[in-house]
Amino acid sequence: MSTNAMNRLAALFVALSVLGVGAAALYRFSQQPKFQLKRVDVRGDLRHVTALSVRSALVGRLRGNYFTMRLDDTRRLFETVPWVAAASVRRVWPDRLLVTLTEHRALGVWEDGRLLSDRGELFVANPDEAEIYGRLPVFSGPFSAAKDAARRYYELSAQFAPLSLHITEVDISDRKAWSLRLVPSNHEGARPSEGLVVELGRDRAELPLTERVAQVVAAYPLVIAQIGAAPVRIDARYANGLAVSTMAKPMKSERPVRP
């Protein structure tokens, strides 16, 4: 082996030794007791998340210290807390975590007992804790329809507002056909079988749901004037008219919601 090669090899060994010593020193430094997490500060506009619920979800599960904690894993851990929609986590020197939480806002109850957020996400939480939002509408249908259900709910609610009708049930079939149950806004405590059922069918380019609802809203006062009472069912699946019934027929979502 040439002298130059031996010199390069010796320099490499020296460099590796220095790196090894440095890494060992850094490891010993990072393991000092003063870097063990001693405090977790939680912030956010929180109405449901409590210190107890956070502690119950995280006890014995936080791993690492200021240097070794994996922030992505920790963030996902906080997002398992009931009502938490999103979390951000950052370190605060030398022994703290600052966690900012965003809560779900409940829009309704899905037929399987989970809550539907206003962003169309299904999540597990105690439905009784959602009472601060008032009586929640019940949604039924394939889980893949959740995002569309939330978005459409706001659109359709705004359309029915001039009639002072409030949506209490939304049913989406496997074929994506829509049915709604509505009650007068001052009778939101009505029994599940009461109110007006509106069959809208599928959302089609040539006859969108919003257009069909507009037809119902325009015709509703005329229907009441003609039959002398509020109808219990309106079938708006037709392109050129509405079918009105005064005989009630159960909706799929009238089945008991599973806990």
Q: What are these model-derived regions, one by one?
A:
Residues 1-39, 49-65, 69-76, 87-88, ...:
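Charged, solvent-exposed interaction patches on well-folded alpha/beta domains
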Residues 42:
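Extended, alpha-helix-rich binding/interface surfaces that flank or overlap catalytic cores
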Residues 81:
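Acidic-histidine catalytic/liganding microenvironments
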